[in-house]
From Swiss-Prot:
Residues 1-20 form the signal peptide. It comes from Trichophyton rubrum. The keyword Signal applies. The lineage of its organism: Eukaryota, Fungi, Dikarya, Ascomycota, Pezizomycotina. Pfam families: Inhibitor_I9, Peptidase_S8. PROSITE patterns: SUBTILASE (PS51892), SUBTILASE_ASP (PS00136), SUBTILASE_HIS (PS00137), SUBTILASE_SER (PS00138). The gene is SUB6. InterPro entries: PCSK9_ProteinaseK-like, Peptidase_S8/S53_dom, Peptidase_S8/S53_dom_sf, Peptidase_S8_Asp-AS, Peptidase_S8_His-AS, Peptidase_S8_Ser-AS, Peptidase_S8_subtilisin-like, Peptidase_S8_subtilisin-rel. The active site is at 167 (charge relay system), 198 (charge relay system), 358 (charge relay system). Its main location: secreted. This is Subtilisin-like protease 6. GO terms for molecular function: serine-type endopeptidase activity. Keywords: Allergen, Glycoprotein, Hydrolase, Protease, Secreted, Serine protease, Signal, Virulence, Zymogen. Residues 36-120 form the Inhibitor I9 domain. Secreted subtilisin-like serine protease with keratinolytic activity that contributes to pathogenicity. GO terms for cellular component: extracellular region.
Length: 412
């Protein structure tokens, strides 16, 4: 995954339908979290109807004793609510089979899917330049041909743009960020640090002073994965919701700030309608999102949020413009970016070299921030701009997959 560790791709299948509500089941290899579910409402459901539904749920939970079989510990019930852009409303929590059946009988509910484990995906005219770049990916994005050691870029370098890194956190004190990184929110544990390193590496590629594409961008840590690089799908969606609200000026819809914001998700799990709908809500709010395609060397349509068409899905390339052997592929892939043996930042002030589509995606996020800083329009349409600028050079990209490798338009 660049994704660092492997996420298991799976297609969710409809298990049953009760009064129009689908109850989905994950395939046999998904790491489902016992008794945890995400309940997604129909798009036409109003805020008032959503609140009425969750009020009913709370009252219903209070009126019954929900206990696990063979255990005296009660079920937690509803734990989080989500509202993204006025078009995606959902909640998640811990429920027994009887409660799931009751919830599914409500006409306002679109579908219910099990919560599961999500993991990292690692395995110009006024140009300035950086010689002897510490990571080959920088030189490749700034040049039409491979093999260079200089990164050519405009000195605007993403200034005035904010990048939300939805990951394991960021070492915001790393000297390469020069004070441009800050802590946002934590949705997975009580440690407001990057105890894994994945998020810091990703953020370094997006906006490090030496290691980043957008050297002037502001960075915000949104922690959704723990020290082991894993978390729940529901927790990831909660982080997506928070980031969208911040990027939209703290509100629920599109604001001027949205067009000056980018997001990176170097993570993924089995295909999830809930995750894809949340990603679409972010795109609909006018925010550009780069997403890792995954590291299973298979069609990325089986992974989320990579399979959501409105995001910019990124596969990983090698130093000689080949497809990285681990990289996912397929029609949902928008572009390739450097993802094999990428050197970037490590918590504690040092560096590390990692491989994965997790490393490719931040090249695209950083390029998105860079282009917005140059005056290009932000939002999901920025992916089309990036594709038009890209060069069709990837050798054997995979069946039905683009061969386009990102390029910053330096003219070099």
């Amino acid at each position: 995954m660049g994704f660092i560790t492997k996420a298991i791709p799976i297609v969710l299948a409809a298990l049953s339908t009760v009064n129009g509500a689908r109850i989905l089941e994950a395939g046999p290899h998904a790491e489902a979290i016992p008794n945890k579910y995400i309940v997604v409402m129909k798009r036409e459901v109003s805020d008032e109807a959503f609140n009425a539904h969750t009020t009913w749920l709370s009252q219903s939970l209070n009126s019954r004793i929900m206990r696990r079989a063979g255990s005296s510990k009660p079920m937690a019930g509803m734990q989080d609510k989500y509202s993204l852009g006025g078009i995606f409303r959902a909640y998640s929590g811990e429920f027994d089979d009887a409660m799931i059946k009751d919830i599914s009988s409500h006409d306002d509910v679109d579908f219910i899917e099990p919560d599961f484990v999500v993991r990292t995906t690692t395995n110009g005219t006024n140009l300035t330049h950086q010689d002897n770049v510490p990571s080959w990916g920088l030189a490749r994005v700034g040049s039409k041909k491979p093999g260079g050691t200089t990164y050519y870029y405009d000195p605007s370098a993403g200034k005035g743009v904010t990048a939300y890194i939805i990951d394991t956190g960021i070492d915001i004190d790393h000297e390469d960020f020069q004070g441009r990184a800050k802590w946002g929110e934590n949705f997975v544990d009580q440690q407001n640090t990057d105890c894994n390193g994945h998020g810091t590496h990703v953020a370094g590629t997006v906006g490090g002073t030496k290691y980043g594409l957008a050297k002037g961008v502001s960075l915000v840590a949104v922690k959704v994965l723990d020290c082991d690089g894993s978390g729940s799908n529901s927790g990831v969606i909660k982080g997506m919701e928070w980031a969208m609200r911040q990027a939209s000026g703290g509100g629920n819809g599109t604001a001027k700030a949205a067009g000056k914001s980018v997001m990176n998700m170097s993570l993924g799990g089995p295909r999830s309608e809930a995750s894809n709908q949340a990603a679409k809500a972010i795109s609909d709010a006018g925010i550009f999102m780069a997403v890792a395609a995954g590291n299973e060397n298979m069609d990325a349509q089986h992974s989320s949020p990579a399979s959501e068409p409105s995001v910019c899905t990124v596969a990983a390339s090698t130093k000689d413009d080949g497809k990285a052997d681990f990289s996912n592929y397929g029609a949902v892939v928008d572009v390739y970016a450097p993802g094999k043996d990428i050197t970037s930042l490590k918590p504690g002030g040092s560096t590390d070299t990692l491989s994965g589509t997790s490393m490719a995606s931040p090249h695209v996020c950083g390029l998105g921030a860079y282009l917005i800083g140059l005056g290009k329009q932000g939002g999901p349409g920025l992916c089309d701009t990036i594709k038009k600028m890209a060069n069709d050079v990837i050798q054997s990209p995979g069946e039905g997959t683009t061969g386009k490798l990102i390029y910053n338009g330096s003219g070099k």
